[in-house]
Curated annotation (Swiss-Prot):
Protein name per Swiss-Prot or TrEMBL: Uncharacterized protein Rv0959
Region annotation (Disordered) ranges: 1-41
Listed InterPro entries: VWF_A, vWFA_dom_sf
Transmembrane segments: none
Compositionally skewed regions (Basic and acidic residues) per UniProt: 1-10
The organism's place on the tree of life at top rank: Bacteria
Species assigned in the record: Mycobacterium tuberculosis (strain ATCC 25618 / H37Rv)
Entries under Gene3D superfamilies matching the protein: von Willebrand factor, type A domain
Any GO CC annotation of this UniProt entry: plasma membrane
SUPFAM superfamilies: vWA-like (SSF53300)
Length: 672
């Protein structure tokens, strides 16, 4: 329920009401719009989908566009909304046709002629026989028949009424094409009503004449609206807004005409001259159309549609259908988001609500809010090159998600360390305990003072006195530091065999684990293809697969050695994820480091250089684990031999278990 007073449905109606009747509030039914009680947009699912697409090789901008197109588990995407828009358009064309006015005129004409024949059959004079001959000679064309009957002297009052209805219907249909709702509004209209319509058209054309010459003023417009505002429910605020609304409707009327067959156009053109019994209305509308086409040449005045259904539309209904179709086509383009600079804010929510209902507009508004929220809450930002990128906050969230999935696979193993002792050099655990003789941990000041205050609460003292019994210390734990090198294969085979995304999620999970639970550890991610290079988690996430020859594990091991030597006091760990034999190495790493030798099958020199790299890891005391992906027998033989040589381990996980295998191995080392 929402209150009827004020714009805010949850706010008291006015300060005066609140002061005079402090506890009195008035409520009325909720009238639509955004749900004021709806929960905020959930970004977790959205960010996870964007991260998946970025890791698969899409840019953040492209990933966001794909998310908006697909939607989420709980939110309809733009593609589905566009499909509904296109379905509605096809339905309008398939179910309806534009013969309604001609069919209705023919029906009224037949009824008028039949009633007149019945009246003539009862008459015995010669004039009645002559009148029957006139009716027999009427042409088959309804337009020509109506024209010939213009001077006919009707004997039947019922027949005369039917014939007058034809002229009245034509006038109302022509006006309904330009002013929505006129057909119903003028049903049973009097001559005075028709005179007011004619006067409105004359005044409107005069106003547009002045506007075309640049002589109109806001006062002219205000006077016109004061006099004729009832004909314009859109309530335009100036001449430009008036032109916008009139031109859209007039362009739809022109497309209605373009969609007719030549025979239908000829019939309606001839009939239009009889609207309201004279050609004056048609002349006024032609003058109005000329003004609108000159003022708004960008409207679609030449388009047409092919209707193929059985439901007949009149001129006004057909014009509205064509206006709806144009609006639907515009919505389809907006929802496609396929043009430069596209944004969900471009979608006309009012038009979407008119065509598909309020829920569709709510869904589109939520998509736009989702797009803004990802930027405003810091998950997307722009780099120095102006390109969108995932922010550090987004990377932390993606790492958290990846680690959560890995933790579920590890079945509750938490990786606690066994080396835990109190000491000033340790890291705070968040716990406190009473001080004991020999403790070197820092005092926890807040707990110490609280104990002293509570102990002396019953006594009155000018100052707080602290005793040994009050002192509590902050508990710490000593953490053994590790230097971890994660070597991930980024050769093109990883992309081709669908190992790209699991590899990236594995790296993200390990990175997040180290950054949040083992902050003293030094993790270095090294990506190796034809060359090897150190990368951040964000760089690896956005790394695109590139077709290039070479799996240069030798270069990666050399970079890992540098990392381990920089952290000589830490326990060294080397984790290698690869799906192929080493096929490249650096010939002159100590020189310029740019000369790559490639050969397939692997050249003995490449094997020798790579083995020496593993030997170097062993000399540094590194715990080496190799995660072999795929079933390449050559890789299996090489990895098994190397692992025995350096006393390392070989793990052969499936793709779904890669993250759990790598993180689990790291935790196994940390528990030792």
């Amino acid at each position: 329920m929402a209150k009827s007073d004020g714009d805010d449905p949850l706010r008291p109606a006015s300060p005066r009401l609140r002061s005079s009747r402090r506890h009195s509030l008035r409520y009325s039914a909720y009238t639509g719009g955004p749900d004021p009680l709806a929960p905020p947009v959930d970004l977790r699912d959205a960010l996870e989908q964007i991260g998946q697409d970025v890791m698969a090789g899409a840019s953040p901008r492209r990933a966001l566009s794909e998310l908006l197109r697909r939607g989420t588990r709980n939110l309809t995407g733009a593609d589905r909304l566009a499909a509904e828009v296109n379905r509605r358009r096809r339905e309008l064309l398939r179910r309806n046709n534009l013969d309604g006015t001609l069919q209705e005129i023919k029906k009224l004409l037949d009824e008028a002629v039949l009633a007149e024949r019945k009246e003539l059959a009862r008459a015995l004079d010669d004039d009645a026989r002559f009148a029957e001959l006139q009716l027999d000679a009427l042409p088959a064309s309804p337009a020509k028949a109506v024209q010939e009957l213009a001077e006919y002297r009707w004997r039947s009052g019922q027949a005369r009424e039917k014939y007058e209805q034809i002229k009245d219907l034509l006038g109302r249909e022509l006006l309904d094409q330009r002013f929505a709702g006129m057909k119903q509004a003028l049903a049973g209209a009097t001559d005075d009503d028709r005179r007011r319509v004619t006067e409105m058209l004359d005044d409107l054309n005069d106003l547009l004449d002045k506007h075309a010459r640049g002589e109109d003023t806001q006062r002219d417009f205000d006077e016109f609206m004061t006099k004729h505002g009832e004909f314009f429910p859109e309530n335009p605020r100036n001449v430009e807004e008036l032109l916008d609304s009139l031109a859209k409707r007039a362009a739809a009327a022109q497309r209605f005409r373009n969609s007719l067959s030549q025979e239908q156009r000829d019939e309606l053109d001839a009939l239009a001259q009889q609207a309201f019994g004279s050609p004056a209305l048609m002349r006024a509308l032609d003058r109005l159309d000329a003004h609108l086409q000159a003022a708004r040449p960008g409207e679609d005045w030449t388009g047409s549609q092919q209707f193929s259904g059985d439901n007949p539309f009149g001129m006004g209904e057909g014009t509205q259908a064509l206006a709806d179709i144009a609006e639907l086509e515009q919505l389809a383009e907006q929802l496609s988001q396929s043009y430069p600079g596209a944004s969900m804010d471009d979608v006309d929510l009012d038009a979407l609500a008119r065509q598909l209902g309020d829920q569709a507009a709510v869904d589109a508004r939520t998509l736009a809010e989702l797009e803004r929220a990802l930027v405003n809450q810091g998950f997307l930002d722009r780099g120095s090159d102006g390109q969108w990128r995932l922010s550090p906050k987004a990377m932390r969230r993606l790492g958290e998600t990846a680690l959560r999935d890995v933790a579920q696979q590890l079945s509750g193993r938490h990786g606690e360390r066994d080396h835990r002792r109190a000491g000033a050099a340790g890291e705070l655990t968040g716990a406190t305990r009473p001080w004991q003789f020999g403790d070197t941990e820092p005092w926890h000041v807040a707990r110490t003072l609280t104990n002293a205050v509570l102990r002396q609460a019953a006594a009155v003292h000018d100052r707080i006195r602290i005793t040994v019994e009050d002192v509590e210390v902050a508990e710490t734990e000593t953490r053994t530091q590790a230097a971890v090198a994660l070597l991930v294969d980024t050769s093109f085979s990883m992309v081709m065999e669908n190992r790209w995304l699991p590899m990236k999620r594995t790296a993200l999970a390990l990175h997040h684990l180290v950054c949040t639970r083992f902050r003293s550890d030094a993790l270095q991610i090294i990506a190796f293809g034809r060359y090897a290079r150190t990368v951040t988690a964000a760089e690896l996430t956005g790394l695109a697969g590139v077709y290039e020859q070479g799996t240069n594990l030798h270069h990666a091991l050399a970079l890992a050695g540098r990392h381990l030597r920089r952290h000589a006091g830490a326990q060294p760990v080397v984790l290698v994820v690869t799906d192929g034999e080493p096929t490249a190495h650096l010939e002159d790493f100590d020189g310029d480091g740019t000369s790559v030798f490639f050969d397939y099958p692997p050249h003995p020199r490449t094997i020798a250089h790579t083995v020496r790299g593993f030997d170097d890891m062993a000399r540094l005391g590194a715990q080496v684990t190799i995660f072999r992906l795929g079933s390449d027998p050559g890789l299996a033989r090489f990895i098994d031999q190397v692992a025995r040589r350096v006393q390392g381990r070989v793990v052969v996980p499936d793709l779904d278990g890669l993250g759990a295998a790598v993180v689990g191995d790291y935790l196994r080392f940390r528990r030792r």
